[in-house]
């Protein structure tokens, strides 16, 4: 390998790296040529993808490496090789420079100790060890995926055991019946629980029973329920109760009743009673006419009609 800063020179009689494509006829010469080509290919990939993080890659070196990869690709096309698999070759005897002592991490998972790319005893062709440069330029992941030498048989996945639809449907019915049970759906609830515990045929026979048996089951179900649960099973649920009884049953509103006109007996014990004379005295400064304490506290309907006409007219 050339040192850092050294120029690459081409020898016309050298079997080749960048010149004419040599097609050797003998077996050992072909193996040596394939070894050289594989070594150059690996070194080119290493230089192309292993850059220092703080230095920018040189454009001239990148162009030379890409040209070398294109030449190897043209040779592979002329030889008619199929899509090869990339495997790193044996390390050269000369120690590389400091920049390329370690292999790039992108190709670390591709090293296979069992097979050598240019083993003489292997039955695979020698060109199958090389990867075209077009695959490298198009997608970096295509040449990183190594194909297995002996594909393993696909494992047969056992299909998951599917539960019958009736069981899931009956369990859903059970949940619904627990949330909102009614007297009309007790027959369906008993049939659903029986279908979960027993077979589907037994559930079908129970659904086809007469109305007398269903009424007997309803009575047994109502007897088995606790006393506080009987309120929820009635069809007239919340008909006798009002919203105030439910929401404001635990709230003592006697402390918050400040209206003197609507004071009840409970408020009279806690608040001082307000007479009509005191109320008229407090309302006297806001009235246009003088109000006497003996005047009855009432509203005239004609004044209300006049006020409504004024409001509608405005």
From Swiss-Prot:
It comes from the Eukaryota. The keyword Signal does not apply. Residues 77-119, 181-222 are annotated as: Disordered. Residues 235-311 are annotated as: Required for transactivation activity. Its main location: nucleus. A motif (Nuclear export signal (NES)) lies at residues 238-243. Expressed in adipose tissue. GO terms for biological process: negative regulation of cell growth. The keyword ATP-binding does not apply. It is found in: Nucleus; Cytoplasm. GO terms for cellular component: cytoplasm; cytosol; nucleoplasm; nucleus. Polyubiquitinated, which promotes proteasomal degradation. Residues 33-80 form the SERTA domain. Residues 210-221 have a biased composition (Basic and acidic residues). InterPro entries: E2F-SERTA_domain_protein, SERTA_dom. Interacts with XPO1; which mediates nuclear export. Interacts with TFDP1; modulates transactivation activity of TFDP1/E2F complexes. Acts at E2F-responsive promoters as coregulator to integrate signals provided by PHD- and/or bromodomain-containing transcription factors. May act as coactivator as well as corepressor of E2F1-TFDP1 and E2F4-TFDP1 complexes on E2F consensus binding sites, which would activate or inhibit E2F-target genes expression. Modulates fat storage by down-regulating the expression of key genes involved in adipocyte lipolysis, thermogenesis and oxidative metabolism. This is SERTA domain-containing protein 2. It comes from Homo sapiens. The lineage of its organism: Eukaryota, Metazoa, Chordata, Craniata, Vertebrata. The gene is SERTAD2.
